[in-house]
Amino acid sequence: MKRSIILLACTTLFCGCGTPNRSAFTGARGEAELIVLHPADEQLAQVQSRMNPQINRTVHVFAPEGEGLQSYLARINAFNSRPDSATSWNEVVSNEGDFLARMLGEKPGNVALLSGRTATAAGYSAACIGAGLNVLSTAPLASGTPKFRELERSLGLADEKGLVLYELMPERYEIAALLQQALARNADFFGIQLCGSPEAPAIVSESVLPLFTVRMEGTGSSTALRPGITGPPANDKTANATGENRDNSAFETAPADYDDWSYPADSLGLQNAFLLAAAPRIDLIQLAVFGRERIKYNRQIQFTSARQYPAAVPEREYLRASGSAALPPALQPYRSGDTLRLPGNGELRYVLNGVHTGVSIRHYLPGSGTAPAQRESPATAATAPEDKAASHADAGTTAGMTVGTTGIPQALPAPYRKLALQGEKATLTLVERGGALPQLYIVPAPGTDSTRFAQSLLAALGQLAPLCPGLGIEPAGTAFRVVIPAEARTALPQRIEKAASQYLDYLVQGYPPFWEVDQMLAKYYTLIRPFDESQQQ
């Protein structure tokens, strides 16, 4: 009964509670006054990579003394001192005592900027909304059913108070992803979205990501592996555990700042690894299926299967890859004999608005020389018993999730991400890998005349000229690769800037669109509900 009351209250708040002129924001210069709370990740600092006239140059920072704070301040200092397009942020730091209570008492701004700490994001956002602050988070806003309910309440309270609670999603602004979504909505070209089956989903997302990133620590040339879902910098060819050159001719090389393949994980621990990696993928899937439409998660999402399992990393491989003499204390809880059993792998199959969907996340140890590569054979990890750890080197396409593997370059070196949408007339496959620009491949349905299909594809791309002019195609096996002009590509800082600008627009509006709220809740319901249920069982 309590749950029903909460949901009804939230639904009531989301439906029509917005009133004209409810926002104090007008778009005036410097009116958005940032409060940075407990910084911990790169994306948070990237929000300040460029000056925005709507954001006040004085930023108040509340955080405990430590590496997270110092790393954030170092990045801001780098932005302020770079030779070109230098910023002029004035950072006012408070790092003593109970920083959260002090911030809530002083409230020296109107927008709280939260960083990548999944464990605390829900509590921080609830406290800020309760204190009358808008919230922009670079961290997933919920992990576990209690935090999901807290997010529901916070969104309802934000709407009641005329505040905006929003999660930064720069992945939405990648041009290849936008083109994939646009083509999927072109019924004449794509046809209807096929439904698939539990055994063979029609929408498939697969990710193979590093469990750690190698970072230089302080002095000398020693390296240390830091736990979390972080990836090698895009320009770091030595970080490719397969030993293959990232500048493969099948891919366009990405600029160094295009995508750092990192997640805000240093302070998260490994327990939220699957959620952190899967959240942006599910966000893209929802946009592909629904566009900017509302989702009723308790009606339009049903779960087929879900499991999380650890990656088994031999301790000797960790020590060799990290150059460490001994296992750090943070990893001791994951030690089993001479093997580290590190959480983060997982597979989720569910039905989204009638479409069977599969999401797979797997991890590897960079520097071990045994990263998994994409193949069409089922993975050992996919068929292992649930109580058995899968080797971090297990390779292959997850069993049954073969949509998007036909007709595109195979044997992709890790890290890589793939998102495939199977339609009546074509399959749209977005492929990303570290060090290369994301590519969009279009595979015609079986029996389709290739020449006519190419003409149809060019016509469909021509209709997207307002979104991206100058698109072309080139054959790639039995598929066609969409050739995207270089000027249409944006680096990660620019995508973060676009996401932040969208948030500022919502501040002026006074509330986010209903579809944003619905899709945020649907995303976390998808990420949390099936795994909580499986643990209870």
Regions found by a protein language model. Give the residues of each.
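Sec-dependent signal peptide recognition
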Residues: 2-7
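N-terminal glycine-/serine-/threonine-rich beta1-alpha1-beta2 phosphate-ribose binding loop
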Residues: 8-10, 17-133, 148, 152-160, ...
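Short helix/strand-capping hinge loops at secondary-structure junctions
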Residues: 132, 139-141
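A contiguous active-site-proximal alpha/beta segment in oxidoreductase catalytic domains
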Residues: 142-223, 227, 234, 243-257, ...
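Catalytic core of tubulin tyrosine ligase-like
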Residues: 211, 218, 287, 420, ...
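Rossmann-like dinucleotide-binding domain that binds NAD(P)(H)
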Residues: 217-228, 234, 251-373, 409-413
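C-terminal helical cap and adjacent loop that interface with cofactors, partners, or active-site loops
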Residues: 281, 345, 367-378, 399, ...
